Each structure stands twice: as structure tokens, then as C-alpha cells.
Amino acid sequence: MKKIVVLCSLLLLAAVLPMQAQRFAYVDTEYILSKIPEYQTAQDQLNRLSEGWQKEIEALMNEAEQLYRKYETEKVMLSEAMQAQREEEIMRKEESAKQLQQKYFGREGEMLRKQQELIKPIQDKVYQAVKDLSAADGYTIVFDTAGGANVLYANPKNDKSDAVLKKLGYSN
């Protein structure tokens, strides 16, 4: 009987010890990034590029719209060949705008490349700082609460966002 009690105690202890060793923390990467001036500069640059590209696309779409309106008013006076030519011109203009939109904002577009070039290095530094902090302080899991992640409650003492900023050399 004594052996069974000792064995059960050892099994219980073996099950409880690993649970106590796990430490959790969380960070808010949106907050961290908002405190990094280089990130804000990169975001501003991306916004300016995006606005310029959007204006370029809108200009092409406006040209197509003007061609279409002009075509509609002159349609009755045009031969079938001229109508077909104008319709083709309008479609080419619209297609050109769509291609430009794809070039700038598509899955492998300029915007994505610029984000990779400007934003990713900053995000990588933040990620590395989180990893370093986790290793130094013994956290097994670090959650990110940015963007409304599914964390229902987190004790503010476990928020390590300011510690990450400090590790990156920024004060809050």
C-alpha cells in the first residue's frame, strides 16, 4: 500500500512539475510598431506610393469613362467599323487600368514588394527581440494581442510590449 501511495505521489509530481515550468507572456505588436519611428516613416512612404499609384489607375479609368461617354453620344453617327474601333479602344483602356492595378496591388505587385522591403526588416527586429526576451526570461509562449486576437483576458503584468521596445532601444 505504501508503495502505491509513493508511486502515485511521484506520478502526480511528475505531471505537475512541467505545468509549473511553463511561463506565458503577451505583446501588442501594433503598439510596439507604433512606437518605432522607422516603422512610421515606412508606413508614410507606402501610403504615398499607394496614393500615387491609385491616382494613376483612376486617371486611366477616367479616360476610359470619358471615351465611353463620348462614344455613347456619337454612336448614332458612327459606322459599324468605327463603333467597333471605339469599343475596342475603350476596352483596351479599361484593360490597361486593370493590368496597372494588378501590377501595383496584385498578389505579387509592387506594393507587396515595397512592404517586404520596408516593413519586414522592422518586423523581423521586433520578432527577434521577442525571441530574445522569451529566452532570457524563460517564457515558453508569447501571445500577440494586436488586431483583436482571441485573448479574453490577460493580466497587464504579463504584457511585455514595453520590455520589447526597451530591448529594441526605444522608450515608451
Positions of the model-derived regions?
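Sec-dependent N-terminal signal peptides
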Residues: 4-15
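Sec/Tat signal peptide C-region and signal peptidase I cleavage site
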Residues: 16-21
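Amphipathic alpha-helical segments
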Residues: 22-137, 141-149, 171-172
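Short, exposed beta-strand-loop hairpins at the edges of beta-sheets
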Residues: 152-154
